Swiss-Prot record:
InterPro entries: Enolpyruvate_Tfrase_dom (IPR001986), Enolpyruvate_Tfrase_sf (IPR036968), MurA_subfamily (IPR050068), RNA3'P_cycl/enolpyr_Trfase_a/b (IPR013792), UDP_GlcNAc_COvinyl_MurA (IPR005750). Phosphoenolpyruvate binds at residues 22-23. The lineage of its organism: Bacteria, Pseudomonadati, Thermodesulfobacteriota, Desulfovibrionia, Desulfovibrionales. It comes from Lawsonia intracellularis (strain PHE/MN1-00). This is UDP-N-acetylglucosamine 1-carboxyvinyltransferase. The keyword Transferase applies. Its EC number is 2.5.1.7. Belongs to the EPSP synthase family. MurA subfamily.
């Protein structure tokens, strides 16, 4: 099993390029099964979750060719079953539920897996698809759905679920009639999915707002499309520059989508400039404490909570983090504490009192973003940090140690 060995204390300096967005690429890949002609996707990151999705789509009947960041998907005879051995490793697999029902009128999908960061229930997906005419049973760990034809309707989501909005957006694009999604998630990745579907011939209005109108069409065509940059990877690199008191130009970085993150970093005393080719982070001497509450977009993203907590751990003063999106998303706290961080938990709130320095230690990643926070802490720590379970990191970061080493980090990957 791979592990990362990080020698901390080196300020980062140089230019790092942001990869394509994992959270946009996954639903777009899955939506491609609705196309009746070849789909070509560019800027697709080379990640473990992408490879899992490709395997799943091949089992469902698609032919896929991949060359680095380009994927060509050719539709075939679509199958309706998503097997446990793939779905159990990646939560986004549940996104095949809506499109399979929309195109085939039936679906058999194993209950999903992925990061262990709380219940993350799929009941909102199921309730909404039932309102569109689907019926579901649960048998032997599989969710089995069937319908004559999904029909457009008015759906109010009790919570602006990202996965639920994506599932319904894809399914409604070839449903019969108009679907209105109210209280829809507004994340940029959903906008990217909508733009892809529109490029394939879907009729969608209001994407990027909390009310989306989808007029179903009989079928979707193929298209050529480029995946948006990964705002969470960009935010992670911003944090890497600040935590090492380094100087980075983050190329291909979406400024508008990062405003909630950038505003918090500026409150911490970090100097950030918008440049034509990306975002510049200047060296800093002292980090200030701040308070963060995770919210759906355009609020501060839960996927950056662990990373900013690593930064807070060496900031002057006491910071707080309120996690409102997922339960059990503080599993990185005890690992940061092993490195000397002073963090106290009170329910869904973490109180972080900054320390003078972190110290290298053996730590273990528990999920994707927790693993990123440990890498960041390791970059800043005095001494050697060893991170086990790097497969979590590989689910969402493309060549992270290579990118960081290229700007001055000292990270070695070993297999034991």
């Amino acid at each position: 099993m791979d592990k990362l060995i990080i020698e901390g204390g080196y300020p980062l300096k140089g230019t790092v390029t942001v990869s394509g967005s994992k959270n946009a690429a996954l639903p777009i890949l899955i939506a491609s099964i609705l196309a009746n002609k070849k789909v070509t996707l560019h800027n697709v990151p080379q990640l473990r979750d992408i490879r899992t999705t490709i395997k799943l789509l091949e089992i469902l009947g698609c032919t896929i060719q991949q060359t680095e960041q380009c994927i060509e998907l050719t539709p075939g005879t679509l199958q309706h079953e998503a097997p446990y051995e793939l779905v159990c490793t990646m939560r986004a697999s549940i996104l095949v539920l809506g499109p399979l029902l929309a195109k085939l009128g039936k679906a058999k999908v194993a209950m999903p897996g992925g990061c262990a960061i709380g219940a993350r229930p799929i009941d909102l997906h199921i309730k909404a698809l039932e309102k569109m005419g689907a019926k579901f049973t649960l048998k032997d760990g599989y969710l089995i759905g069937d319908c004559t034809k999904l029909k457009g309707t008015h759906i109010y989501l009790d919570f602006p679920t990202v996965g639920g909005t994506e599932n319904l957006l894809i399914a409604a694009s070839i449903a019969e009639g108009e679907t209105i999604l109210e209280n829809a998630a507004q994340e940029p990745e959903i906008e990217d999915l909508a733009r892809f579907l529109i490029a394939c011939g879907a009729i969608i209005k209001g994407h990027g707002t909390n009310v989306i109108h989808i007029q179903g069409v009989p079928s979707l065509n193929g298209c050529t499309y480029s995946i948006m940059p990964d705002r969470i990877e960009a935010g992670t690199f911003l944090t890497a520059a600040a935590i090492t008191k380094g100087e980075l130009l983050i190329s291909g970085c979406p400024y508008k989508e990062l405003e909630a993150i950038i505003n918090k970093f500026m409150q911490m005393g970090i100097h950030i400039e918008k440049r034509e080719c990306g975002i510049y982070v200047a060296p800093i001497k002292t980090l200030k404490a701040t308070d963060v509450t995770t919210r759906p977009f355009p609020g501060f993203p839960t996927d950056m909570q662990a990373q900013i907590m690593a930064l807070m751990s060496i900031a002057y003063g006491t910071s707080t983090v309120n996690e409102t999106i997922f339960e059990n998303r503080f599993m990185h706290v005890q690992e940061l504490a092993r490195m000397g961080a002073n963090i106290r938990l009170n329910g869904h709130t973490a109180i972080v009192t900054g320390v003078k320095e972190l110290k290298g230690a053996p730590v273990m990643a528990s999920d994707l973003r927790a693993s990123a926070s440990l890498v960041l802490a390791g970059l800043a720590a005095k001494g050697i940090t060893t991170i086990q379970r790097t497969y979590h990191l590989d689910r969402g970061y493309e060549f992270i140690e290579k990118k960081l080493n290229a700007v001055g980090a000292s990270i070695q990957r070993t297999n034991e």
